[in-house]
């Protein structure tokens, strides 16, 4: 079995670099808030009316999840970010890159395993 622990994907906002992690907690929060399966993640960027709000929520959630993981792993205290902070660092020049980085973080956070699920696929 390979390493199932999600790894942080780096993103730069302003002068600061942050990690983003898709943990089970983050996936659960996303599915609950948007009432979608995680496989439908790209749908959150399709509606021009909600795209920005969804992007800010996802980015803050994933950055804060990485901050919490770093604290668990190292004890380092790093302040959380909020959606307003994230929104100040997203513009038309970097929005597409940020969306792609979020999707890459999802891919990086998905465990790679050579084993099949013992009870078939789960929802």
Regions flagged by a language model, labelled:
Residues 1-13, 17, 36-49, 71-123:
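Charged interaction scaffolds used for protein-protein
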Residues 20-22:
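Short capping micro-motif at the N-terminus of alpha-helices
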Residues 24-41:
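Short, surface-exposed, low-complexity cationic segments
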Residues 54-65, 100-104:
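Short, hydrophobic/amphipathic alpha-helical patches that form generic packing surfaces
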């Amino acid at each position: 079995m390979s390493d199932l622990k999600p790894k942080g994907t780096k993103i730069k906002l302003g002068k600061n670099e942050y990690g983003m992690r898709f943990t089970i907690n983050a996936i659960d929060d996303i599915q609950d808030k948007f009432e979608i399966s995680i496989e439908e993640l790209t749908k959150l960027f399709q509606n021009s009316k909600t795209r920005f709000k969804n992007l800010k929520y996802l980015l803050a959630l994933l950055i804060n999840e990485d901050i919490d993981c770093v604290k668990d792993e190292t004890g380092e205290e790093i302040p959380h970010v909020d959606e307003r902070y994230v929104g100040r660092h997203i513009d038309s020049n970097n929005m597409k890159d940020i969306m792609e980085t979020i999707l890459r973080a999802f891919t990086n956070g998905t465990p790679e395993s050579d084993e099949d699920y013992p009870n078939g696929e789960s929802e």
